[in-house]
Amino acid sequence: MEKNLPDIFFFPNCVNVFSYKYSQDEFSNMSKTERDSFSLAVFPVIKHRWHNAHVVKHKGIYKVSTEARGKKVSPPSLGKPAHINLTAKQYIYSEHTISFECYSFLKCITNTEINSFDEYILRGLLEAGNSLQIFSNSVGKRTDTIGVLGNKYPFSKIPLASLTPKAQREIFSAWISHRPVVLTGGTGVGKTSQVPKLLLWFNYLFGGFSTLDKITDFHERPVILSLPRIALVRLHSNTILKSLGFKVLDGSPISLRYGSIPEELINKQPKKYGIVFSTHKLSLTKLFSYGTLIIDEVHEHDQIGDIIIAVARKHHTKIDSMFLMTATLEDDRERLKVFLPNPAFIHIPGDTLFKISEVFIHNKINPSSRMAYIEEEKRNLVTAIQMYTPPDGSSGIVFVASVAQCHEYKSYLEKRLPYDMYIIHGKVLDIDEILEKVYSSPNVSIIISTPYLESSVTIHNVTHIYDMGRVFVPAPFGGSQQFISKSMRDQRKGRVGRVNPGTYVYFYDLSYMKSIQRIDSEFLHNYILYANKFNLTLPEDLFIIPTNLDILWRTKEYIDSFDISTETWNKLLSNYYMKMIEYAKLYVLSPILAEELDNFERTGELTSIVREAILSLNLRIKILNFKHKDDDTYIHFCKILFGVYNGTNATIYYHRPLTGYINIISDTIFVPVDNN
C-alpha cells in the first residue's frame, strides 16, 4: 500500500511541528490536495471518537453523542445542504439542522472509499479531528500538545533527526507498506528514543485497519518494543513516558513487561493502541497479539532476539509491521537482504549533536602475548586519562571485557590517579545511587564498565570514552575474550557527543575488529524449542545459522531424550527461565519444586530442596588438573560428563585446588565431590 503521510498528521516534535486546530476559514482557503488530506482523519476518528457513538438531538440540532448530550434519535435523511453556517459549523436544511461532524458521522459508513469524500464530509472530519487533537502544523507552541494522548503535560521538544518531517514521511510509508523494515542511523539520531514514539503515533491514528483507501472494520493492537535487557525496558519506557507528557504509567499509552516486574511499574489502565516495552523472552509469549513489532539492538544478536526475528519472518502475515533497529548494518546487511521478504531499508542520516574527537593509543605488545598486552594497556590507560581528562564535574567511561577486569582495572587506576572510581555492569544493583554520586560530584569520575554501558544506561555528564576494544563472549561452560565488531565500536563511541563535545580514546588496532558469530558459542536448545513451538524449519528458518550444524542436531537429540511433550515444553518456555535446560526435568516433577526452583532462578536463593533436586540430575564435571593463578584463585582444567557437550573441555576458577569431580548447580554455582 503506497501512502504518503500528509503534513497535518506529523507527530509534534515541538521544534517545527506543533499540535494545531484548523478553522473552517482555513479549510475554505486550502487547495483541493490540502483539503483531501483531512479524509484520513476518518480512521482515528472512527476508533477514538465515534466508536459506540450515536445521533442525538441537542437544542433542536442533530449532533453526535460525543459532541453533546441528548436523547438518542433516528438520523435525518441527508441530501445536499441548502445552506452552510461556517460560524456555527452547521449544515442547514429546510426541515432540520445538523452539525458538520454529525453529517460526516452518518456519511462515513463501512466500505465507503475515502477519495469519494466531498467537502461537506471533510469539514466534519476537520471538526472531529480538532476535538481529538490529531492535527499538526509548522506553527504553534509546546503547550498545545497537552491532552493529545490524555497527557497532563506538554510533549518534549525533540530536535533529533528521526522526528524531522522528512524522516516521519519515510518511516510512515515503510510502516504502512507492511514490508519488514530495517532502520539504521547514527547514535544520537533518536532511533530508540523517538522512532517507537512515532510508530505509537501512527498506530494511534491508523493502526488496525487493513487499508487506508476505504472504511473497514478495525482490529486494534498495541505496538511492542522488544529489548534484550530489563535495564533497557526501564530506561526507554521512562524516557518516552516523560517525553509524551506523562508522570505516571497508569492511563498512559506506555506499558512494561518483564519477569518479576514490581507492582508500581504495571500500567493498570493500558491503552489498546499503546506501546509495550518488553524483554525479548516475554515478547515471544504473546508475539501475535501486537500489530507493530519493533526489535531493537539487532546488532547484539541476543539469542531470543534473533529467534523473534525468525518467528516474525515465518509468520509475517500475523503481524502488521516489523521494524528492526540497529546502529549499523556492517555485519548483517547481506543476510537481511536474503532472509527478509522484500525488506525496506531506511537510514536516518545525522550524527551526535556534538563533535566527537578520536584518539588512538598504540599498544606495542602483540595481543597474542595476553598478559604483557594487558599490562601495557593499563599503563597506556593511565597516561591517556592524564592527557585526555574529563572536566571537573564530568565523567569518563572505561570499557573492559568482563566483570573481573572491572575490578582489576579499578584497583590499578585507584593507585595511580586522583579521581573518583566506580564500577557499573549488569550485576550491579545500586546503579542509580552510583549515578547520583557521579552527577553530584565536583570531581572527575571514572566509570569502569563491561559492554553493559554500550546501551543499557545513559550517563548524561560523560565526555570521554576509553575503549579497550574487547568483549567477553560466553560459551557453554566457559567463554573467551574477543575484539569487538564495528557495530560495538560505534555504540561505545556514541556514548559521548550527546550533551557536550566528546573524546573517544581507543587502545586497539582497528584491524583487530571482527564480526562476532554469537550463535557459535551458545547453548542451542532455545532454537530447537522455539522452532518446535512456532513450526520453524531448521536450520533454514533461523536468522543466523550455526557454523557447526552437528551441535544443533545433537541438541535436538538431547532434548528429545527428556521425553517431555511439545505442549509441556511450551508451558515451560512461557513460565520459567530454564537457565540450564536440564532444569526442565525438575519443573515437570511437582508444582512445589517448580515454585522453589523458579525462585532460585529469579533470586539466587538456593534452598536445600532445590540443591538436592539439582544434584540428583548428576550434572558432573571431571577435574583433569589445575594451576595456581594468584593469591586466592586456582584455574581448573576439566571435562564435561553430561549433555550435548559431553567429552568437551572446560575451565573453572575456584578459591582452592580441587580434585576428582564437581556437580553443576547453575552456570555460576558448583559443588565439589571429594574422593569420587
UniProtKB/Swiss-Prot annotation:
Gene3D superfamilies according to UniProt: P-loop containing nucleotide triphosphate hydrolases
Superkingdom of the organism of origin: Viruses
Entry-linked SMART domains: DEXDc, HELICc
Compartment(s): Virion
Domain Helicase ATP-binding as annotated: residue spans: 172-347
SUPFAM superfamilies in alphabetical order: P-loop containing nucleoside triphosphate hydrolases
Enzyme Commission number(s): 3.6.4.13
Induction line: Expressed both early and late in the viral replicative cycle.
GO molecular function term, any single one: ATP binding
Chain location of the short sequence motif DEXH box per the record: 296-299
The protein's role, per its UniProt record: NTP-dependent helicase that catalyzes unidirectional unwinding of 3'tailed duplex RNAs and plays an important role during transcription of early mRNAs, presumably by preventing R-loop formation behind the elongating RNA polymerase. Might also play a role in the export of newly synthesized mRNA chains out of the core into the cytoplasm. Required for replication and propagation of viral particles.
PANTHER family listed in its UniProt record: ATP-DEPENDENT RNA HELICASE, ATP-DEPENDENT RNA HELICASE DHX37-RELATED
Protein name: RNA helicase NPH-II
Phylogenetic lineage: Viruses, Varidnaviria, Bamfordvirae, Nucleocytoviricota, Pokkesviricetes
